[in-house]
Amino acid sequence: MAIGVTQNTFQLNIVSAEGPLFSGKAHALAISGLDGELGIRPGHSPLLSRIKPGVAYFQTDLKGDDEILYISGGILEVQPSLVTVLADTAMHGKDIDEARANEARRAAEENINKQGNDINFAQAQMDLAKAMAQLRAVELTQKQRRR
């Protein structure tokens, strides 16, 4: 490949502890890194980042909708033509139980608001972030289906 010339896709592999979720060509990936949102396109500079709980979007077709995933955290490795997401947990938005995510959000908020030293505040915040990310993935998937 000549310097300055990039392909229009990269190989994207998304794997969670439960198994592979996606392996194929992608045009773009947006994911929540520890220091902020990351946008990955073909030819991106090498990068290694921790992933925080959030929604990941990736585009496999320039004309189609984004694929939407909930990612609970993990590691992102980027090479110019290969991107690997090693997720602790990952789910397609359509596979998330909205009622369970709402209950997890409510329980986390309740734990944060409790007075006393018997709660782990950092863990409660992490639980809340995960529940909110799941609900966001559900919301975005539902909006996409309505179009």
UniProtKB/Swiss-Prot annotation:
Which keywords appear in this protein's UniProt record, sorted alphabetically? ATP synthesis, Cell inner membrane, Cell membrane, CF(1), Hydrogen ion transport, Ion transport, Membrane, Transport
Cite the GO molecular-function annotations of the record. ATP binding; proton-transporting ATP synthase activity, rotational mechanism
Q: Which SUPFAM superfamilies match?
A: Epsilon subunit of F1F0-ATP synthase C-terminal domain, Epsilon subunit of F1F0-ATP synthase N-terminal domain
Against InterPro entries, the record matches this protein to: ATP_F1_dsu/esu_C_sf, ATP_synth_F1_dsu/esu, ATP_synth_F1_dsu/esu_N, ATP_synth_F1_esu_C, ATPsynth_dsu/esu_N
Q: What does this protein do?
A: Produces ATP from ADP in the presence of a proton gradient across the membrane.
Quaternary state and interactors: F-type ATPases have 2 components, CF(1) - the catalytic core - and CF(0) - the membrane proton channel. CF(1) has five subunits: alpha(3), beta(3), gamma(1), delta(1), epsilon(1). CF(0) has three main subunits: a, b and c.
Protein name per its UniProtKB record: ATP synthase epsilon chain 2
> What species does this protein belong to?
Photobacterium profundum (strain SS9)
